[in-house]
C-alpha cells in the first residue's frame, strides 16, 4: 500500500501545474510565430522579378527590389530602415514578413500561401479582390 509519503505535496502539485501552464503558453507562442514555408518566399521572388536581385524598379517606377515593394507597403510593415533597403533580398523578406503578420496573422500562422500572396499583391484586403486570384494561384503553384 502507498502511504502519505507517496502522494505529491501541494507544492509539487502547484509546480507541476505551473510547468504545464508554461508549456502550453510556449506552444501557443510558437504557433503564433509560425511562418509560411521557405518556398513561399522563393515563389514570390520568382513571380515578382524572375528571381533577380538588386535595385530592380518595377510597376512603372512605383516598386523596388527583388520582391517589388512599394513605399506605402514598406511604411505599413513598420520595419525600421530606409525604403532603399528593399533592394536587398533579406531585408525585403523581413518587410514582407512584418507586413503579412500585421495584416494577415491567421494566414501567416496557418502558412496559407494563397492568402499571403494575394495580400502581398493587393494590399491589406487583397485576399478578397478578384484581381489577385491568378497571382495567388501562381505563387502557390511555384511554392509546392
Residue map of PLM features:
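Short, Lys/Arg-enriched N-terminal segments with co-localized hydrophobic residues
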Residues: 4-18
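Compositionally biased, intrinsically disordered/low-complexity regions enriched for serine, proline
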Residues: 5, 33-34
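Residue-level detector of alpha-helix boundary/anchor positions
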Residues: 6-9, 24, 39
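Short hotspots in intrinsically disordered terminal tails
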Residues: 15-16, 29, 141
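A short alpha-helix capping/helix-coil boundary motif
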Residues: 20-21, 96
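Sec-dependent N-terminal signal peptides
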Residues: 21-31
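Catalytic glycan-binding domains that act on GlcNAc-containing polysaccharides
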Residues: 34-144
